[in-house]
């Protein structure tokens, strides 16, 4: 369900959307024949009111493929289920301790205000590289994220909209990774991975927000 769809019986005041995609990466730059899993779900309240509030959660994972160092990274049904449910698995120690594959969670909180021939959208996006994932604003890396505002209008023909965004990635849940063995996180080094060293790019083009 790519578009916001009214929840039955609530007259459009509650809308939902979500889906699941599974893709293959064909560039074969470092890990050959790696795969991408993406699922998302979201809800919006407000409907015909001038103010709407929406929340979305996205989970994306790189998994499978063949590494020049580690060989087969798991390309069977069980490996897919590990990626789908963020479970540990595989033959490598990092995948046994954490989760099989390279996982990212993203949360998006959006406030929409609509008027006569104009609309203002203010949004906040937060990324999670480590678990446990908490609601946006309560995680270990709350200072990091993308904040934006988008204004569209139909009054004047010479401009249709204006967007401003601010990105911060310096907190990274603190400088140390798993310093006590109980609180997992820190030194997130977003978009990098020791196994999938080509990172989140496809044919040398960044997937997602560039830094």
Which residues does each PLM region occupy?
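Flexible, solvent-exposed coil segments and beta strand-coil junctions
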Residues: 16-24, 86-92, 125-129, 209-210
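Transmembrane beta-barrel strands of outer-membrane/channel proteins
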Residues: 18-24, 53-59, 122-126, 162-168
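Short loop/turn motifs that connect adjacent beta-strands in outer-membrane beta-barrel proteins
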Residues: 4-17, 45-54, 113-119, 153-159
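Outer-membrane beta-barrel pore domains
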Residues: 95-106, 114-211
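A conserved mid-domain beta-alpha-beta active-site/ligand-binding segment of alpha/beta enzyme cores
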Residues: 25, 37, 43, 47-114
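Sequence/structural signature of outer-membrane beta-barrel proteins
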Residues: 7, 21-29, 62, 127-133, ...
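Transmembrane beta-barrel strand/turn architecture of Gram-negative outer membrane proteins
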Residues: 35-58, 145-156, 163-168
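Outer-membrane beta-barrel translocator domains and adjoining extracellular loop/strand segments
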Residues: 28-36, 66-70, 132-137, 174-179
């Amino acid at each position: 369900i790519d578009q916001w769809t009214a929840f039955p019986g609530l007259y459009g005041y509650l809308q939902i959307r979500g889906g699941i995609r599974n893709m293959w990466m064909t560039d074969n730059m470092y890990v050959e024949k790696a795969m991408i899993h993406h699922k998302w779900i979201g809800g919006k309240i407000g409907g015909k009111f001038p103010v709407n509030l929406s929340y979305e959660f996205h989970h994306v994972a790189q998994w499978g493929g063949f590494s020049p160092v580690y060989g087969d990274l798991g390309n069977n049904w069980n490996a897919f289920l590990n990626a789908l449910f963020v479970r540990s698995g595989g033959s490598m120690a990092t995948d046994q301790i954490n989760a099989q594959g390279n996982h990212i969670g993203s949360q998006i909180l959006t406030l929409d205000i609509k008027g006569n021939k104009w609309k203002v959208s203010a949004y906040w996006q937060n990324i999670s590289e480590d678990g446990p994932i908490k609601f946006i604003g309560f995680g270990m890396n709350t200072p990091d994220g993308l904040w934006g505002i988008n204004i569209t209008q139909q009054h004047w023909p010479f401009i249709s909209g204006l967007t401003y965004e601010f990105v911060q990635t310096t907190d990274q849940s603190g400088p140390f990774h798993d310093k006590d063995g109980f609180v997992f996180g820190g030194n997130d080094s977003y978009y990098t991975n020791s196994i999938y060293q080509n990172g989140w790019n496809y044919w040398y083009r960044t997937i997602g927000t560039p830094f």
